[in-house]
Amino acid sequence: MLLLSSFITVAGLILFETVSSVDNAIINAEVLRTMQEKARRWFLLWGMLFAVFFIRGVLPWAIVWAVVPAIGPIDALTATFSSDPKVLQAIEQSSPVLLIGGGTFLVFLFFHWLFLEPKNYGLKIEHFFAAQGVWFYAVVSVLLTLIVWLALKRDPMMAFGAVIGSSAFFITHGFKQNAEEQERKLMDRGMSDISKILYLEVIDTTFSIDGVLGAFAFTLSVPLILLGNGIGAIVVRQITISNIENIKKYIYLKNGAMYSILGLGSIMVIDSFGVHIPEWVSPVVTFVILGYFFVKSKLAHKG
């Protein structure tokens, strides 16, 4: 049963990481076209290793260790497989802080897309919210106030976690907002390939935070996150190399990724307040939502 649960979790992580990184793959492909062959190969090899082992391995491990410093670096890596009751108790007591922070980040990310970002409209209601963009900051401010108010009743550290999650959103959003402008500059062949590689690494790191935080809705196991998100990152690199134009044809994949992010963020916030949600729920929610928008994209392409 544990093996089946781990398999479903990893499969969900791979799918979520792949689809949520499509925008990143498109930026990578556009910039790589302006680089020399040697620089492209360097980025696709060493950049991938950095993305897989550092961002999707070290970052979730560092987050778990920061949230539960008492268990130490080794137990932070293997905590979910540990039989030590002290380690399991420490994880259980501290996980709400991680869950509420990551959940707040993801919910903010969804509402920013819903209210402010240009999109292919996959659902009729998206037209309404796109016309109300001015309300984005009011909505997330009220939402954060509500989450913090409820969290303070349980644990002040949970409230602090929610604030950290919202701060992380606005910091990473600043990097993403600058990405399009910087991409236009980097398309100029006069800039060095080293500058372009450094830019791509920064952008990849920024985009990866969504996937890393979303992964905690599936599991707190760092090895499973590394495996699932790592394979997803490799798939994204392959898409960058050979299939980016085909992926662009699936116009509603981004919609699916964002609704999945809403689902995962909501699960994390609810779970942080002590409502037990089975581990299989996050993968199933991801499969169903992404499957729906994949089919919708397929039908739109044929039509």
Please provide the spans of the model-predicted regions.
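Multi-pass alpha-helical transmembrane bundle typical of ion/small-solute transporters
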Residues: 1-303
